[in-house]
């Protein structure tokens, strides 16, 4: 249908998230009819459009570090795209960065890592932060026998930690600096 409406000199540009497998059949059909050009996240785009700084934080470097860690822990298909951060061009505020992380980055990481918060902590550098107020994801040791009655030591795979999102960290520029 799309190909029939295009004149010889026109191009059809489509983007897609390669991690989204819900459209696999449609994707296969489109791949047979069109050329694909891979476009991975590119922090230089943020630098070129001046969307790479919030206060004295190098947002492009933060994106690179997050994506390096995601690639190591998962794969390159689940890296965070630079497009999430392009809004910083018009509003280079901490509040805008906070919104990007709270509404886009954290939910994607939760989905990608199936809510394995320890891996999310690694991606965000929380595992190396000594100040809990700077951690995006907090962890608290859980003692099963304090929660359940009876003998729980024999039960396999009980969690040893409970995780929570630390809303305070999102409004502190140092939380982002310590990702690096």
Model regions: which residues?
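C-terminal engagement/docking regions of AAA+ P-loop ATPases
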Residues: 121-180
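A general structural signal for short secondary-structure junctions and capping/turn motifs
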Residues: 4, 27-29, 69-77, 154-155
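Switch/connector loops and helix/strand junctions flanking conserved nucleotide-binding motifs
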Residues: 21-26, 45-49
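A short beta-strand-to-loop transition that corresponds to the Sensor-1 phosphate-sensing loop
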Residues: 14-20, 40-42
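Short glycine-/polar-rich loops that comprise or flank the Walker A/P-loop
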Residues: 9-10, 30-35, 80
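A short helix-turn-beta junction within AAA+ P-loop NTPase domains corresponding to the substrate/partner-engaging
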Residues: 25-43
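Conserved AAA+ ATPase small/helical "lid" subdomain
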Residues: 47-137, 141
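Single conserved hydrophobic/aromatic residue that forms the stacking wall/gate
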Residues: 1-8, 13
